[in-house]
Amino acid sequence: PGLHTATKGNTALERDTRVANMFIADMEGRKDKKKPFFSFLFFDLPHSFELPADKNKHFQPAWAFADYTKLNNDMDPTPFWNLYRNTCYQDDLLLGKVFEALKKQGLMDNTIVVLTGDHSQEFNENHRNYWGHNSNFSVHQIGVPMIWHVPGQQAHKYTHRTTHYDMVPTLMKEYLGVKNPTDDYSMGRLMTDKTPRLWHVVGSNLNYAFIIGKDSILEKTAQGSLDVYDAKMNPVKNYVLPAKQFDKAMKQLNRFFK
């Protein structure tokens, strides 16, 4: 009950605005103020690259829409980048209203809030004509914000590598009182664990890659072979596969499918 699988609206801005307003109304209408709750808000504007003209003014010059026919390796990405920034700006305004609603209800004092994304957007940073997402596993497409608000904790910035699958172990062990080892239910670790990662996996069940060390990208192709790139998406020839690390990664990837 209360789970919405679709949001009405003709545009991404209309849908994102409705998502924020529905959440605010839900917070204001809560009868049992002490009852724990979980909410998931998904904003789509930075994915859609679409805005009404009157909302596309904050960062200039900006494209009116994402004209993919004009993308090439030699173009200036600024107008496309500014369109993206304007979509983020509009969602930032909506997030401000969401946080203000939580403050008004006194919920910022006892609610963990996580702000992140499911992927990033690339704007040809590596000058290999990659744009948007879902075309490679470089940091420009998989690196996202990870911002936590935890009541009672001092603000702190971490610069070590984390992953989305660190979220559940952190919540379970640090805040929900789960005692058993995190390996029982997750590939992740605590967000605050600065131990260097020898590898991690990114992607989905069918389309994924292994990030080995700091900058080696081992991408599984549709044929089942591995293509290897460095951090700037330059193909790596004669790559010596670290067999032990790769074997461990494959076992971890499959162990929850028993």
Predicted regions, residues:
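Beta-strand elements within well-structured catalytic alpha/beta cores of enzymes
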Residues: 36-44, 88-91, 95-98, 111-120, ...
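Membrane-interface soluble catalytic domains
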Residues: 103-106, 150-258
